[in-house]
């Protein structure tokens, strides 16, 4: 992914105006596109605005976000505030994968499982739902490392649920570069966008698609199918 890409914040005035618009349109569920919510000082102001707006207008009913990877005291405070006012949809403790090889290939790192488990315990003490997010199909991930990683996650954690997502290819990312694909044997399949928390699109609306990884140097299509079956069963049984 574009892990080193620079970004700029929208102004707080614009963010607050969008929250007011959500309440005006009586939108029940809001998904925050910020992939590291809670890492910046202004995020507490945004959380307070959400609480204030819900108190006044009863909307939005629920707010979901992707929390910063290095969970800090501020994230605990923000999550507690949202949970207190029944806005919280749960705290993400994202790992993507437990495979060191896959992490190296996508230029990511993880906190240790012991520290991860401690964070989960702290959130559970506050009755804040916790869920883990994993990504299936990253380059360098074998079937055995995938299964072993999920098993270790369950054995050492107390998360309420595990969400497993397909690895996707996005424009303007290293994973979409021809030389990167060749190096890791990446092949993708284009499918219709799998949307949740929304009504079916009207036929005349623009159709959207996503490119998911279905082959790598460590995974052929049959292996991908096998991983999918295992992952779906795990999510059903562990939820």
Region spans (language model):
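A generic secondary-structure signal for well-formed alpha-helical elements
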Residues: 26, 54, 127, 157-161, ...
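Conserved SAM/AdoMet-binding glycine-rich loop
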Residues: 12-131, 136-138
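Charge-patterned, long linear interaction tracts outside catalytic cores
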Residues: 220-239
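Flexible glycine/acidic-rich beta-alpha junction loops that bind and position SAM and/or redox cofactors
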Residues: 40-42, 96, 100-107, 136-144, ...
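Short, hinge-like loop/turn segments at secondary-structure boundaries
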Residues: 49, 149-150, 179-183
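Phosphate/diphosphate-binding loops
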Residues: 65, 150-153, 164
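Canonical Radical SAM [4Fe-4S] cluster-binding loop centered on the CxxxCxxC motif
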Residues: 1-13
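Catalytic cores of alpha/beta
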Residues: 77-80, 139-155, 223
């Amino acid at each position: 992914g574009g892990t080193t890409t620079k970004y700029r914040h929208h102004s707080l005035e614009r963010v607050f105006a969008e929250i007011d618009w959500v309440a005006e349109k009586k939108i029940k569920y809001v998904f925050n596109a910020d992939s590291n919510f809670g890492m910046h000082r202004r995020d507490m102001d945004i959380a307070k605005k959400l609480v204030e707006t819900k108190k006044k207008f009863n909307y939005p009913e629920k707010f979901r976000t992707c929390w910063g990877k290095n969970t800090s005291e501020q994230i605990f405070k923000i999550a507690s505030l949202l949970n207190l006012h029944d806005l919280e949809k749960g705290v993400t403790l994202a790992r993507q994968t437990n495979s060191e090889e896959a992490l190296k290939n996508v230029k990511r790192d993880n906190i240790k499982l012991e520290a991860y488990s401690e964070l989960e315990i702290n959130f559970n003490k506050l009755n804040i739902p916790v869920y883990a997010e994993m990504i299936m199909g990253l380059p360098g991930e074998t079937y055995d490392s995938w299964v072993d990683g999920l098993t270790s996650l369950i054995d050492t954690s107390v998360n309420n649920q595990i969400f497993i997502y397909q690895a996707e290819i996005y424009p303007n990312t290293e994973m979409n570069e021809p030389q990167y694909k060749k190096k890791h044997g990446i092949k993708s399949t284009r499918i219709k966008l799998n949307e949740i928390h929304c009504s079916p699109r009207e036929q005349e609306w623009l159709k959207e698609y996503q490119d998911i990884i279905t082959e790598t140097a460590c995974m052929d299509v049959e292996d991908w199918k096998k991983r999918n079956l295992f992952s779906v069963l795990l999510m059903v049984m562990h939820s």
